[in-house]
Amino acid sequence: MVTIRADEISDIIRERIEQYNREVKILNTGTVLQVGDGIARIYGLDEVMAGELVEFEEGTIGIALNLESNNVGVVLMGDGLMIQEGSSVKATGRIAQIPVSEAFLGRVINALAKPIDGRGEISASESRLIESPAPGIISRRSVYEPLQTGLIAIDSMIPIGRGQRELIIGDRQTGKTAVATDTILNQQGQNVICVYVAIGQKASSVAQVVTTLQERGAMEYTIVVAETADSPATLQYLAPYTGATLAEYFMYREQHTSIIYDDPSKQAQAYRQMSLLLRRPPGREAYPGDVFYLHSRLLERAAKSSSRLGEGSMTALPIVETQSGDVSAYIPTNVISITDGQIFLSADLFNAGIRPAINVGISVSRVGSAAQIKAMKQVAGKLKLELAQFAELEAFAQFASDLDKATQNQLARGQRLRELLKQSQSAPLAVEEQIITIYTGTNGYLDSLEIGQVRKFLVELRTYLKTNKPQFQEIISSTKTFTKEAEALLKEAIQEQMERFLLQEQV
C-alpha cells in the first residue's frame, strides 16, 4: 500500500505556487452599434485615445476619430463587410505607425506600408508614427541648395530649393504629373531619395508612372505609395502621411528627399466623405472645418534640417487640380497659402503646343534665387523680365497694324525664348545644358534662325559642347559659376556650331 507523505505533497504544492504566474490583462473593449459606409459606431471603449487603432473581432483595423458622450466613431481601414452589429471591438493602445527601412526603395506600397507590387514582403526593424510633429524653428535652417527639376522654365525662373514646398497647380490634362515625374528622373545621381504618393488616381495612371520610372532606372531611389480611386476613403486619407513618414525617415538620417503628393485635393475629398459620415458639421464646399489643418500638418513636415540635425532635407511638391482654371476655390487657396510658391500650368498654353505649359507670369517661388547656383543666377537673371515684356507686347501687337523695327526685334526674340523653354516629356536637362540653352537665347544668337529651327539647333549645340568642349561642363560643375573662361568656350562653340548648322540647312 502506498503511503502518502504530507511533506512531499506540501513540497509539490509549494513548487506549483512558486511557478504560478499571475497575469492580469486589462482590455478596453466595446460593442458595435452600427456599421456601414466605412464607418462604425461603437458603444464602450471608454478610455480610447483620439486617433487610436482599434481591432474588430474579425481582424479589421479602424481608427477612433470621433469621441462622443455615448459612442465612438471609428473609420475602417478596409471594407468591413464581415463586421456584424453586436460584435466586440478592442482598443490596441497604439497610434497608427508603419515600418520604415532602406528596403522600401524601389517598391510600390499601400497606405499601410504593405507591398502591392507582388515582389514579396519588405523587411524592416524600425517603425515610425504616421502622424509625427513637424520640425520646429530651431530644427530648421533656410533653404539654400537647389533641387534641379531638369525643366528650364522652372530651374531658371521658378527655382525650387531642397526643403521647400512648391505647389504644382493646373487643370486636368495639363502635364502636372509629367512635371513631377521629370523631377524624379532628374534626381538620378544627385543623391536624392524620391517618394511619389498617388491618392485616388486611376490604377492605370499609377502603373504608367511606375513603368516610366522603371524604364529610366529611377525606381532604384524611389518609393511609390499608391491608394487608387477604388480604395477606402480612410486609406486615401492616410496615404500622404505614410509617404511623409518614409521621407522623414531618410531626412533624419541626413539624406535629401523629395516627396510628390498627387493630389491633396483627392485626400481632402476622402476626408470630407469620412467627416460627413461621422456627422461632423460641414463648412465651405461641405469640407469640414479642419481641412486646412489636414494639409498644413502634412506640408509643414517638409523642411531643411539644421546643421545640428545633419542638414537632411525633405522637399514637398503637392499637385492640385483646378476646375477650369479657378485658383480661388477652397482647396487650391488653402494649399497656396501653406506652400512657398506655385507653378501654374495653363490649359491654353498646353493646347497651343507650349509644353511644359508653365504660365511664368503667375508662377512664383518664394525662395527665389537662394535656390539657384551662381551660374544660373548670372545667365537667367533677365529671362523672366524679357518674357514678361514679350507677353505684354504680343498682346498689344495683335491690335497694331505697323510696328517699328525695335518692337519687331523684341517680338522675334521673345518667340525664340518661348521656343527654348519647350521640352519633351521625360527628357530633363542637366543644369550645364540649361545654362547653354538660356545663354544662347538671351544673347540673341537664335535671332537669325527660323522659329522651327531653334530646338534642332539647341539639341545639336548641347551635343557639340559635350563632345568637343567638355571643359565647359567641368568648369560649371566644379565652380558652380559662369566664369569668363566658360563664357569664352560657349561663345566659340555657338559660332562654330552655327556655321555648321547653317551649311547643313542649305544642303
From Swiss-Prot:
Which GO cellular component does the record give, naming just one? proton-transporting ATP synthase complex
Q: Which residues bind ATP?
A: G170, D171, R172, Q173, T174, G175, K176, T177
Q: Which Gene3D superfamilies match?
A: 2.40.30.20, ATP synthase alpha/beta chain, C-terminal domain, P-loop containing nucleotide triphosphate hydrolases
**Pfam families named in the record:** ATP-synt_ab, ATP-synt_ab_C, ATP-synt_ab_N
Molecular functions (GO terms): ADP binding; ATP binding; proton-transporting ATP synthase activity, rotational mechanism
InterPro entries cross-referenced by the UniProt entry: ATP_synth_asu-like_sf (IPR023366), ATP_synth_asu_C (IPR000793), ATP_synth_asu_C_sf (IPR038376), ATP_synth_F1_a_nt-bd_dom (IPR033732), ATP_synth_F1_asu (IPR005294), ATPase_a/bsu_AS (IPR020003), ATPase_F1/V1/A1_a/bsu_N (IPR004100), ATPase_F1/V1/A1_a/bsu_N_sf (IPR036121)
Residue numbers marked as site, Required for activity: S363
Q: Does the keyword Transport apply?
A: yes
- Enumerate the UniProt keywords alphabetically: ATP synthesis, ATP-binding, CF(1), Chloroplast, Hydrogen ion transport, Ion transport, Membrane, Nucleotide-binding, Plastid, Thylakoid, Translocase, Transport
* UniProt superkingdom: Eukaryota
UniProt subcellular location? Plastid, Chloroplast thylakoid membrane
Q: How does it sit in the membrane?
A: Peripheral membrane protein
Q: SUPFAM superfamilies recorded for this chain?
A: C-terminal domain of alpha and beta subunits of F1 ATP synthase, N-terminal domain of alpha and beta subunits of F1 ATP synthase, P-loop containing nucleoside triphosphate hydrolases
Listed PROSITE patterns = ATPASE_ALPHA_BETA
Question: Key word Ion transport present in the record?
Answer: yes
Reaction(s) this enzyme catalyzes, per UniProt: ATP + H2O + 4 H(+)(in) = ADP + phosphate + 5 H(+)(out)
Family, per entry: Belongs to the ATPase alpha/beta chains family.
Q: State whether it acts alone or in a complex, and with which partners, per the record.
A: F-type ATPases have 2 components, CF(1) - the catalytic core - and CF(0) - the membrane proton channel. CF(1) has five subunits: alpha(3), beta(3), gamma(1), delta(1), epsilon(1). CF(0) has four main subunits: a, b, b' and c.
Its biological purpose is as follows: Produces ATP from ADP in the presence of a proton gradient across the membrane. The alpha chain is a regulatory subunit.
Q: Which NCBIfam families does the record associate with it? A: atpA, PRK13343.1
By what name is this protein known? ATP synthase subunit alpha, chloroplastic
Q: What is the lineage of its organism?
A: Eukaryota, Viridiplantae, Streptophyta, Embryophyta, Tracheophyta
State the encoding gene.
Answer: atpA
